Swiss-Prot record:
This is Probable lipid kinase YegS-like. Its main location: cytoplasm. Residues 1-130 form the DAGKc domain. ATP binds at residues 37, 63-69, 92. Mg(2+) binds at residues 212, 215, 217. It comes from the Bacteria. Its cofactor is Mg(2+); Ca(2+). Keywords: ATP-binding, Cytoplasm, Kinase, Lipid biosynthesis, Lipid metabolism, Magnesium, Metal-binding, Nucleotide-binding, Phospholipid biosynthesis, Phospholipid metabolism, Transferase. The keyword Kinase applies. The keyword Metal-binding applies. HAMAP family: YegS. Belongs to the diacylglycerol/lipid kinase family. YegS lipid kinase subfamily. It is found in: Cytoplasm.
Length: 296
């Protein structure tokens, strides 16, 4: 069997369940290398090392940010030398893994990441150098996910993002911008901007419910209203129609703003006044369960 490399977020290096799952894989006679990340840039270095280890799969062990860092590093390799991506969900929200029906039980998730079916999936590229595998959020949604205290996330998991968001309703500020894509033009003030390759963000909220990771498209969702915000947020996440929620499905978008906007790319903040976002169809192979609801 080809070798596998697990890139593990340093926060999980002492996790006894991870150690047991790794031991069980090795006891089957499979070669599983493990590398620990301690600072930004480690994942890229380990992905580059994967080429010298004859690795066919690189597993991201951590949350959505770790998955993003590993997927971004994979894109720096030539397409014909790019290992498959495996996912071991160990974060707070685990939005991409949950959306894919990847098991949250560590043993089962690692077995899938090592042996699962490899499927070609899309990635979204931002300004030619940044990527997201799940979702980019702007406006209020970004401030929730980037400012939610670590202690609250640890205590409450994904629901902490929503609770913290409700606590911050008095601090709402819309982002003024223009958004342009194929047969789509919009300008105005957006409270929430969601651009989904995957369906959910912020700890399980279905922000882009129609998104798929292998259709060459991304779903854009805008929330434009400030009035009766709790009711509008409920509409945004439960799929009901509302004139303040704008939807589009496109292969690319240009976003311009008079002031800096911060987008959260799978947990990684990126600020600026211009964003070109496009889907790269079938950019990487990912080991996914057969019942993955993000596949078309």
């Amino acid at each position: 069997m080809p070798h596998t490399l697990l890139i593990l977020n340093g926060k999980e290096s002492g996790n006894p369940e991870v150690r047991e799952a790794v031991k069980n894989v090795r006891d089957e006679g499979l070669t599983l290398h493990v590398r620990i990340t301690w600072e930004h840039g480690d994942a890229k270095r380990y992905v580059e090392e994967a080429a010298t280890l004859a690795v066919s799969t690189v597993i991201a062990g951590g949350g959505d940010g770790t998955i993003n860092e590993v997927a971004t590093a994979l894109m720096s390799l030539p397409a014909d030398k790019r290992p498959c991506l495996g996912i071991l969900p160990l974060g707070t929200a685990n939005d991409f893994a949950t959306g894919c029906n990847i098991p949250l039980q560590i043993e089962n998730a690692l077995q899938l990441a090592v042996k699962g079916r490899a499927v070609a999936i899309d990635l979204a590229q931002v300004n030619g150098e940044h990527y997201f595998i799940n979702m980019a959020t702007g406006g209020f949604g970004t401030r929730i996910t980037t400012e939610t205290p670590d202690k609250l996330k640890a205590a409450l998991g994904g629901v902490s993002y929503f609770i913290h968001g409700l606590m911050r309703l008095d601090a709402l500020k819309a982002d003024s911008c223009k958004i342009h894509g194929p047969d789509f033009h919009w300008s105005g003030d957006a409270l929430v901007i969601g651009i989904g390759n995957g369906k959910q963000a912020g700890g399980g909220q279905l922000l882009c419910p129609d998104a798929l990771i292998n259709d060459g498209l991304m779903q854009l969702r805008l929330l434009t209203a400030k009035e009766l915000l709790p009711a509008v947020l409920s509409t945004l996440f439960n799929g009901e129609k509302n004139k303040n929620v704008i939807d589009a499905t496109v292969p690319w978008l240009d976003i311009t703003a008079p002031n800096d906007i911060t987008f959260n790319l799978d947990g990684e903040p990126l600020s600026g006044r211009y964003f070109h976002i496009e889907i790269l169809p079938h950019a990487i192979q990912c080991r996914l369960p057969p019942n993955c609801p993000l596949l078309g």
